Curated annotation (Swiss-Prot):
Recorded GO CC terms: plasma membrane
Coiled-coil annotated spans: none
NCBIfam families: PRK10629.1
Gene assigned in the entry: mzrA
Protein's UniProt name: Modulator protein MzrA
Functional summary from the UniProt entry: Modulates the activity of the EnvZ/OmpR two-component regulatory system, probably by directly modulating EnvZ enzymatic activity and increasing stability of phosphorylated OmpR.
Keyword vocabulary terms for this entry: Cell inner membrane, Cell membrane, Membrane, Transmembrane, Transmembrane helix
Membrane topology listed for this record: Single-pass membrane protein
Subcellular location(s) per record: Cell inner membrane
Species lineage: Bacteria, Pseudomonadati, Pseudomonadota, Gammaproteobacteria, Enterobacterales
Source organism superkingdom: Bacteria
Pfam family, one: SecD-TM1
Segments in the Periplasmic topological domain: 30-123
Amino acid sequence: MIKRPRWQYVLLIALALLALATLLVPCMVRTESELRIRAGQQGLSLPDGFYVYQRLDQRGIRIKSITPEGDGLVIRLDSPEQQLLAREALQNILPPGYIIALSESPVPTHWVREFARAPLNLG
């Protein structure tokens, strides 16, 4: 049997860990496409979420959720392409004075959600 130097084993393990990290990091750091709508002028009220949902659905844009957040609406979409189509459609649908911003938020992975939901048992 051939005896190899230790540095070769260390290098092999380091390369394997690097390859594993390269494969796992994109799975852990996913983002979700969002649109944020808020009134840019005084006196404008937020559009109704159901109205926005219907108008985007008529144009074939798939929506994950619409939620009020702070002083605006947050629309979560399936993909960045859907995000751009929705922004363009909303600029045509809504009257002037609304600010429609593109954003992305991190999506927690399944194990992170389970860990955050698990109760802390002490003693």
